[in-house]
Amino acid sequence: MTVIQGVIMSNSLSKTTAYVQVIQNDQQAINAAYQVADFALEGRNTRDQQRLLPHEQIESFSQKGLGGIRIAKKYGGAFVSNKTLAQDFRILSKGDANVGQIPQNQISLLNLIEIMGTEQQKQFIFSEILAGKRLANGGPERNTHDSKTLKTTLTIENGKYFLNGEKFYSTGTSFAHWLAIKAIHPEGHVVLVIVNRDAQGIEVINDWNGFGQRTTASGTVKLNQVEVNPELIFDERLLTQVPTYRGAYSQLLQVAIDVGIAEAAFEDTLSTIHKARPIIDANVEKASFEHYTLQEVGKLNILLDAAILLLDEAAEYLDELDQLQTVTDEQVAKASILVAEAKVYANDAALQISEKLLELGGSRSSLSQHNLDQHWRNARVHTLHDPVRWKLHAIGNYYLNGHFPARHAWI
């Protein structure tokens, strides 16, 4: 038994984990995503309207083996392609955008651990995930200068490490076994700390009240003198020592979620139009025969197809980079720009299609029992994370001035 296992096993959660499937290839990952998405679609409206958290659906995500699909094969993962990863999150988000968003932090965090972690750290964390445990992000902090500014601190007292602070936008923490917390080290640099969700001094509060993505539980995490295992402290300075495309990788998941929302809205648009009555002046038998409606549906379909194609193109480029031992600054910049281009179209597709759904569906589409507004609410809230106005700025600056975008999780 290693030191890290010995220390942590004494603090392991008492919760037992059900049998977890082992995904071995891309097709199995896609099949599993469809199964979870079908389950997530059941009761989606009720959960959204009553703010009921999708505990069973997220547990299904873990049991199907989806939590570790990008873990390297040498650690027992399938290491599926980025294209498959994006498709999986499209599928999940079409079923329920909340179920798509909740585990995306885990996928991104595992990538950071792959970059920063020692072999011992990676073996432990990856084995936990493959066993069905979940990792969530203690999110950014409120009332700071910007989303990167931290007040949470890691202190050393009598040779022991402690966390103190408060986080918000902590998507997935209500479902997690482990939390990833960013804090300021006593020496002044930023560290990522992994702590047990049930550790003394941690309080997870489901106070998220956004009008969209209502059941992501993206609320508060309070940290009061939480003792930290020094074996699970990661120095974020390691992220900048060599070029990495971690930002593009993280953003790829956000794009996939937006595309999934757009696909769900488009499907409901077609269904709703078929049930709608035609406008009097149209002089047609069905609303689906209206000339202007046909034109709008055509535009929406093109927009959605473009978003999907750009997402696939960006994912395929990341797959090319995965085959390289090292990447250059130029390749990292291109990755961020390709994902940013996909993000712009995914943003527009999710918002425009979900809005047109209500317009083309007519007055009945506004009735609360249909809950058709959920797609627009989800799209509007999720697209606020990383506004496309800055994506467009980065894209223009790249092509016009040869300026490389910043390196962080938002580009």
What spans do the regions from the language model cover?
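Generic structural signal for well-ordered, non-transmembrane alpha-helical segments
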Residues: 34, 260-263, 298-305, 340, ...
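A short core secondary-structure module
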Residues: 169-204
